[in-house]
Amino acid sequence: MIRHASPQDLPSILRVYEIARKFMAENGNPSQWGNTFPPEEMLKEDIEKQQLYVYTNENLIHGVFAFMPGNDPTYDYIENGSWRSAAPYSTIHRIASDGTERGVFTTCINYCKEQSPHLRIDTHENNEVMKHLIEKNGFIKCGTIYVEDGSSRIAFDYLK
C-alpha cells in the first residue's frame, strides 16, 4: 500500500534510507547519497509538504519516495539530449527500499503513473540497479542534468 508519510514514520524511513545507502555503496555507487543523504530535515519538510510517501505491507514500511507535482528547477537545464515534452510533469526523488520485498520500485512508480501522465526521474551514472529499474518501468533516457552540488545525473522521463 502507498500512503503519505507521517512524522511517526520517520524512524522507519531513516532505516530504509540507511539500508539503501549501504546497498548503493556495496554495489559501486558510494558517492550518490554518501553517508547522510537525505538529511532528516529534508524528510521532515517533505512530510510537512505532503510529498513524501511510503510503501507498506502489513503496516511495515519497506519503501519510501518523494513525489512532487510541478516544475523542478533541477530539470530546467539538460544537456546531451532533451526532454521529450514540455508539458507539466511530476518528479520522483529519493526512491529507496529496504530490500526485503520484490517489486517495491515498480509499485511506487505505478502509483506515480496513476497521479501524473508525465514523470521525470534521475540517478547517478554509477547506480546500475536504479538505471535498470527506471528503464524497465518505461522511462526513456533524455540526457544529463546537474543537481544542487553540481554533480551530474542521468535524467529520464515517462510519458503516458
Question: Language-model segments: which ranges?
Answer:
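Conserved acyl-donor/pantetheine-binding loop and adjacent beta-alpha core of acyl/acetyltransferases
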Residues: A66-T100
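Conserved GNAT acetyl-CoA-binding A-motif
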Residues: T91, E114-N126
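Conserved acetyl-CoA-binding loop-helix of GNAT-fold acetyltransferases
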Residues: S97-E114, H132-K136
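A short beta-loop-alpha structural element at the N-terminal edge
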Residues: M1-R15
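Conserved GNAT-fold acetyl-CoA-binding loop/helix
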Residues: R21-E41
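Conserved beta-hairpin
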Residues: K49-A66
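A short helix-loop-beta-strand connector motif used in the catalytic cores of GNAT acetyltransferases and
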Residues: E41-V54, N71-P73
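Conserved active-site alpha-helix within GNAT-family acetyltransferase domains
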Residues: T106, N126-G143, E148-S151
